[in-house]
Design a protein with these regions (language model features):
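N-terminal loops that bind phosphate or other acidic moieties
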Residues: 2-217
Length: 217
């Protein structure tokens, strides 16, 4: 899988790998027919039915089965925290990571109850944790730069981060992942990315963030 656009004359642009569409009307109809043939009222499984149809299309099978799902949590710190966008310091990111790895966090408890493997990926926190079971090191820096003052990442850092993600997922044992992220101040860069990708004003895409009400208090 190439991380570069071969049609581009410049290799400085980071390109997201192409993901082909998974919609297959014939397969979706076949899966739905299989569900409707069960001895129960049609539609009685609610959201589970549409989810089964969706997963079947993704896995390209009329009898989808999730195998060894992994919870993949990617952690990183954001330079925009210097602008006071969060009520907490960046050091809390590392504390959250340790809580998950020690099995004390909510996601850890839920994963344990359902027999799911949990991996915490250090993509670039300021205060890295020592090596330990469940921790994957794929750092592209000690946090990003302050996006208000300069680009948060270089093109090469972006390419490396995308490549790291592809490699991490490709190396997982199963056929399903549950994605999560953590990092103090993450609402701000997420809003910047969405505004840029969707071509929307920043005011329309930014939210109050963790611990704040709709008014941002």
């Amino acid at each position: 899988m190439s991380l570069h656009d071969p049609s581009s004359s410049s290799q400085s642009e980071a390109v997201v790998p192409f993901i082909p569409p998974v919609l297959d009307a014939d397969r979706a109809a076949a899966i739905q027919a299989r569900l409707d043939a069960q001895a129960r009222p049609p539609g009685s499984l609610g959201r589970l039915e549409s989810l089964a149809v969706q997963i079947g299309q993704i896995l390209r099978t009329e009898a989808p089965r999730l195998q060894e799902p992994t919870v993949l949590l990617c952690a990183g710190d954001h330079g925009l925290v210097a602008q006071g966008v969060s009520a907490w310091p960046s050091s809390v990111t590392t504390l959250m990571m340790q809580g998950i790895l020690s099995g004390e966090a909510t996601v850890s408890v839920l994963a344990r109850q359902h027999g799911l493997n949990v991996q915490v990926v250090d993509c670039g926190v300021i205060d890295p944790l020592p090596e330990q079971p469940g921790l994957v090191l794929r750092r592209v820096g000690a946090g990003t730069a302050d996006a208000l003052l300069q680009p948060a990442m270089t093109p090469e850092q972006c390419r490396t981060a995308i490549r790291n993600g592809c490699e991490q997922v490709a190396g997982l044992p199963g056929n399903a992942i549950l994605l999560g992220e953590m990092g103090i101040g993450n609402t701000s860069p997420a809003s910047l990315l969405l505004a840029r990708l969707a071509g929307l004003p920043i005011e329309q895409v930014v939210g109050p963030g963790a611990g704040l009400d709709a008014a941002g208090r």
